[in-house]
């Protein structure tokens, strides 16, 4: 995270958290602006020893499902648009996002498929309301491919090729979704 922040990365670092844990996780980001300011005031070792204020923990769902990722191979939005979207983030958006992340974790731990689908869909709607530019045509195709299947999908990430993620609740739906994503390119 330190190196990415130093290079001006705008992301939540959720991708790094997933890579570090190699698991389905609950992740709440640190205050990136606060850490950037600390980077200018203290050396690396001191900064790394400090509490960055993030939360991360593995989630063990009580429901069998596949976690699928479809990569668009193209950024959803440019760095300028990322900054515009970032400036549009309101306390209401952040509160709504936190509410959905917490509800999703609870639903996963309880094995409540309907609540999982509802939370993912509401999180997707929050992103779309924040900026329609987030859902490029390719991301819309990835998301819409899940409709009518026993799964739910949403956009995830911004940068060098955005992703659609999906939770699929049966093998047939997983196979159909993967095929639809492959056919879409």
Which residues fall in each region the model found?
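C-terminal nucleotide
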Residues: 2-10, 14-158, 165-185
């Amino acid at each position: 995270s330190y190196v990415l922040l130093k290079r001006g990365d705008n992301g939540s670092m959720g991708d790094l958290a997933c890579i570090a844990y190699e698991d389905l996780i609950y992740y709440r980001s640190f205050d990136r602006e606060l850490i950037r300011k600390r980077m200018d005031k203290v050396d690396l070792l001191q900064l790394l020893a400090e509490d960055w204020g993030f939360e991360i923990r593995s989630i063990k769902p009580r429901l069998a499902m596949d976690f699928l990722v479809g990569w668009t191979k193209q950024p959803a939005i440019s760095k300028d648009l990322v900054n515009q979207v970032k400036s549009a983030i309101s306390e209401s958006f952040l509160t709504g996002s936190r509410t959905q992340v917490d509800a999703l974790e609870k639903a996963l731990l309880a094995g409540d498929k309907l609540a999982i689908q509802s939370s993912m869909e509401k999180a997707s709607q929050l992103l779309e309301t924040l900026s329609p530019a987030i859902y490029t045509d390719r991301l819309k195709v990835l998301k819409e491919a899940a409709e009518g299947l026993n799964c739910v999908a949403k956009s995830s990430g911004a940068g060098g090729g955005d992703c659609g993620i999906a939770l699929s609740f049966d093998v047939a739906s997983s196979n159909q979704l993967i095929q639809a994503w492959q056919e879409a390119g």
